[in-house]
Design a protein with these regions (language model features):
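Short beta-edge strand/loop motif at the mouth of beta-sheet-based domains
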Residues: 14, 34-77
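Intrinsic-disorder/low-complexity, polar/charged segments enriched in Ser/Thr/Lys/Arg/Asp/Glu/Gln
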Residues: 10-16, 23, 59, 71-73, ...
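Beta-strand/loop substructures that line and gate deep hydrophobic ligand-binding cavities in soluble
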Residues: 91, 99-157
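Hydrophobic pocket/interface hotspot
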Residues: 26, 36, 60, 78, ...
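Charge-dense, helix-prone N-terminal extensions
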Residues: 5-8, 31-34, 50, 62-64, ...
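Hydrophobic ligand-binding cavity/cleft-lining segments
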Residues: 1-46
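Hydrophobic/aromatic beta-strand elements that line small-molecule binding cavities or substrate pockets
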Residues: 17, 49-52, 74-80, 115-124
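A short, structured loop/turn motif at beta-sheet edges
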Residues: 23-24, 53-55, 79-87, 121-130
Length: 172
């Protein structure tokens, strides 16, 4: 697959979820450090918010603990914030200081894109909020885009778990 040309339309991850909560509440869950710590990340992962600077150019820096003693780091660099309608950010794996790093998974053979642009929109109808996430690699090589496409199912599962946690968080 690394040698196959990957069309840009093929490299977009698109996930939509309807949540039983008003848009303002869902927006706060995406923009409040305490809330993010409770629902962001795959199921079974403990999130620690290291920094949340919610403004264009600001950073959300976090650690993910899968088990005691095994931490990974990630970050968002916000590009656009239009409350309560839209958030755009570049997501990357990071080191403890917030610098970009390669994905820490050997099976990805250092071919995971360093940066992904994510755009999340929030629309409300009848007291329920639809979140629509679209993500794609940026500044990526052909091989990195191919690896992104090859792992779409895993990303669907990972974001699905996060959005399940978000739905549960919103019931509290």
């Amino acid at each position: 697959m690394a040698n196959a040309a990957v069309k840009s339309a093929d490299t977009v991850l698109s996930i939509t979820r309807i949540l039983d909560a008003p848009r303002e509440r869902v927006w706060r869950a995406w923009t409040d450090a305490e809330a993010l710590a409770q629902w962001w990340g795959p199921k079974g992962v403990t999130i620690r918010v290291l920094k949340l600077d919610l403004r264009p150019g600001g950073m959300f820096h976090y650690s993910m603990a899968f088990q005691p003693g095994h931490e990974m780091y990630g970050r968002f660099i916000y590009r656009e914030i239009v409350a309560p309608e839209r958030i755009a950010f570049v997501n990357s794996f990071s080191d403890p200081a917030g610098g970009i790093t390669r994905a820490p998974f050997p099976q990805l053979k250092n071919l995971w894109p360093l940066e992904m642009l994510n755009v999340v929109t929030f629309t409300e109808q009848n007291g329920k909020t639809t979140i629509a996430l679209r993500a794609h690699p940026i500044n990526a090589t052909e091989e990195e885009r191919a690896m992104f496409v090859a792992n779409t199912a895993g990303m669907q599962q990972g974001f699905g778990g996060s959005f399940d946690k978000l739905a549960e968080f919103l019931t509290k």
